[in-house]
């Protein structure tokens, strides 16, 4: 691991009223390295970083930075020493230019006049961006940039403070695969300049590419540190949650019933063609494939979000006419969408209000909402799904990702559908929350619900599903039973390298390219 460290955080303890958030935590970061922090939500990663940048004061412990013991009373104290943080929620000023955002409050001026020297400002910004190999016009408005480019500018801003250590919090959560590659290239450039990077992520697939060292935290405690090459996925999962990988997918034997959903030759131009599959009661069918293969669009078309050009849908043997999501709901279908914040939840509303949005009719009698019954049912779902919230009146935006996803599931459980579509059901939630969610899915299947899952996580598809349909460029190229399925076979079908040898049965959208030797959990 090396003997000289850019950063040492020693025996850091932080207490809030009634809660010990950090308990004698350690962290050592080498100069010119990427040090990944792993752990579930609530493990203590964010609290530790807030102490490092001066937002919180520790109750105990010390921080040694660049060989000197330091105390930070504010974010500016940390910045002055060369520590900066790129937050997950970016907050640039959209009306300002790139140059104005980077050097806000530090603009070059004409002598004592106080007037900004715009020519010099542009020149300083251009030189900074060129040194980081960022090809963005300094005069461009921040509001015109993509999320990825906004992130690049935030990193450039951090470097403009002559930062020796940059903290990146979930930097790839909202950018494309191509943009991720661009970000990783930039990180490598920073490493060569001797900058240390603390990299917070849930995505294990990124660790092979970017991390030099990994530290794991659990329940406010430091679990351990090792080089990335010495830690397997199973090692990390066990360190993070205290359980083996096979315990996370504790799948019971399925009890399959009659065919409840049958899709025949479904086609949506420019998205997918001739998709056919069946799902039985109690069965979990998964759709795998690369980004753009058509998985999500298949679900959206069955659910009436998109209109099919041709094909038929049968529910319980009867032909179903589904032209809208309302039609799908009438056919006892439910749909957890891919982006819970954009197309699923109403973030400013309460847990209770979100739960009843598709069920409100059953609570209205003679024009009046039966608030007592609503409260009773919502409280039951809160208990049943172990939703961690002080109250069903809590604003849903304030919940963790895992609990937000449970609120969405509760919405559909109140509707009690026979067929449930889950599109990327655990995206953005940590390993422990995923394990809880998987158990809920298994329980629903044991009750006879038919479940169709789209997931970009190979381990999730393999661990959840009784049968897996693989898509490539809008077509179903393979179907595998649970016993037949493995990473290599799925990737062969997903990349078009294998010919389909079995009859059809399909599904939809498998995102980022997953190489055969990588499993992403988190």
UniProtKB/Swiss-Prot annotation:
It is found in: Cell membrane. Its EC number is 7.5.2.11, 7.5.2.7. It comes from the Bacteria. It catalyses: D-ribose(out) + ATP + H2O = D-ribose(in) + ADP + phosphate + H(+); D-galactose(out) + ATP + H2O = D-galactose(in) + ADP + phosphate + H(+). SUPFAM superfamilies: P-loop containing nucleoside triphosphate hydrolases. ATP binds at residues 39-46. CDD domains: ABC_Carb_Monos_I, ABC_Carb_Monos_II. Part of an ABC transporter complex involved in carbohydrate import. Could be involved in ribose, galactose and/or methyl galactoside import. Responsible for energy coupling to the transport system. It comes from Halalkalibacterium halodurans (strain ATCC BAA-125 / DSM 18197 / FERM 7344 / JCM 9153 / C-125) (Bacillus halodurans). The keyword ATP-binding applies. This is Putative ribose/galactose/methyl galactoside import ATP-binding protein.
